[in-house]
UniProtKB/Swiss-Prot annotation:
Pathway: Cofactor biosynthesis; ubiquinone biosynthesis
Enzyme Commission number(s) of this protein: 2.5.1.39
HAMAP family found in the cross-reference section: UbiA
TM regions (residue ranges): 31-51, 54-74, 105-125, 148-168, 177-197, 241-261, 277-297
Protein family membership: Belongs to the UbiA prenyltransferase family.
Protein role: Catalyzes the prenylation of para-hydroxybenzoate (PHB) with an all-trans polyprenyl group. Mediates the second step in the final reaction sequence of ubiquinone-8 (UQ-8) biosynthesis, which is the condensation of the polyisoprenoid side chain with PHB, generating the first membrane-bound Q intermediate 3-octaprenyl-4-hydroxybenzoate.
Keyword Cell inner membrane: yes
Cross-referenced PANTHER family: 4-HYDROXYBENZOATE POLYPRENYLTRANSFERASE, MITOCHONDRIAL, PRENYLTRANSFERASES
Protein name according to UniProt: 4-hydroxybenzoate octaprenyltransferase
Organism in which the protein naturally occurs: Saccharophagus degradans (strain 2-40 / ATCC 43961 / DSM 17024)
UniProt-listed GO biological process terms: ubiquinone biosynthetic process
Membrane topology, as annotated: Multi-pass membrane protein
């Protein structure tokens, strides 16, 4: 009589739970990870003059995934009572009940703890800065209830990897990093306004505030101005960091990508606005390639 072979596959309830946590972290939609990762890579390559320490690089790539995931978890916790009223978010795990609010909070804390353990392998300056990053990640989701400029807080959170990367790689915070920081904040406000434009009608019904609502009919011109200012700030940062021709070319290409995004949102159609938001991944990549090529040439 042969013994019954036990299946090594996870049970359906376990599999459903794992999938729910992955969705809570937005691992099925990694665009947020990419948009935080690109400025991080820019900063590491500039700070290290083209050759980041491998351990610092690994710490920051993992840290970006963990902190972006933590931000998504606390965002869904904060929005759990309103997400059911928005078509795009109605199937999130906290809305459907696959994950409870208590489980979400515990998971958020766990992600922060793991990220902090990684930071402990850097230096005291980076460790100190990490508390600011955690605070920004926690605060952003709640800003949508109190200000029509929550995208600025999001930009501050997304750009926080810049000072942390310089601190980890060089143990210094040169003044020029704040020019690059400002550029990323401006860029983030622009592309997250596109994201908010896709949800504007639902947000108006449920009372959620955003720059898309604040800007109103002037949204296209204001986002275009934000993109232009972001490019100018990037160019200024590039001059201060001694970046050359390749970087300048990358900014010209980024400007062309911004122009295409403005074309996409011309009719303010929600799906097109969301496409414009997603398209910013290419902007981050192009700027990184400009920095990478510049460092390869100069070194």
């Amino acid at each position: 009589m042969t013994a019954t072979r036990k299946s090594t596959r996870p049970s359906k309830p376990l599999k459903a739970t794992l999938v729910a946590y992955a969705k809570l972290m937005r691992l099925d939609r990694p665009i947020g990870i990419y948009l935080v990762l690109w400025p991080t890579l820019w900063s590491l390559w500039i700070a290290a003059d083209g050759l980041p320490d491998w351990d610092v690089l690994v710490i920051f790539v993992l840290g970006v995934v963990l902190m972006r995931s933590a931000g998504c978890v606390i965002n869904d916790f904060a929005d759990r009572k309103i997400d059911g009223h928005v078509r795009r978010t109605a199937n999130r795990p906290l809305v459907t009940g696959l994950i409870t609010p208590k489980q979400a909070v515990l998971f958020f804390v766990a992600l922060l703890v793991i990220a902090f353990i990684l930071v402990l392998f850097t230096n005291p300056l980076t460790i100190k800065l990490s508390f600011g990053g955690a605070l920004l990640a926690f605060c952003y989701p709640f800003m949508k209830r109190y200000t029509q400029l929550p995208q600025i807080v999001l930009g501050a959170a997304f750009a926080w990897s810049i000072p942390m990367a310089f601190a980890a790689q060089t143990n210094q915070l040169p003044e020029a990093i704040w020019v690059l920081y400002t550029a990323v904040v401006l860029w983030t406000v622009a592309y997250d306004t596109f994201y908010a434009m896709a949800d504007r009608e639902d947000d108006l019904k449920i009372g959620v505030k955003s720059t898309a609502i604040l800007f109103g009919d002037q949204d296209r011109i204001i986002t275009a101005c934000l993109q232009l200012m972001a490019l100018v700030a990037m160019a200024m940062a590039g001059e201060r960091f001694g970046l050359g021709f390749s970087f300048k070319v990358s900014l010209l290409v980024a400007g062309g990508l911004f122009a295409y995004q403005q074309y996409l949102i011309r009719n303010r159609e929600p799906n097109a606005c969301f496409r414009a938001f997603l398209h910013n991944n290419w902007v981050g990549l192009v700027v990184f390639l400009g920095i990478l090529v510049d460092k390869l040439i100069t070194n």
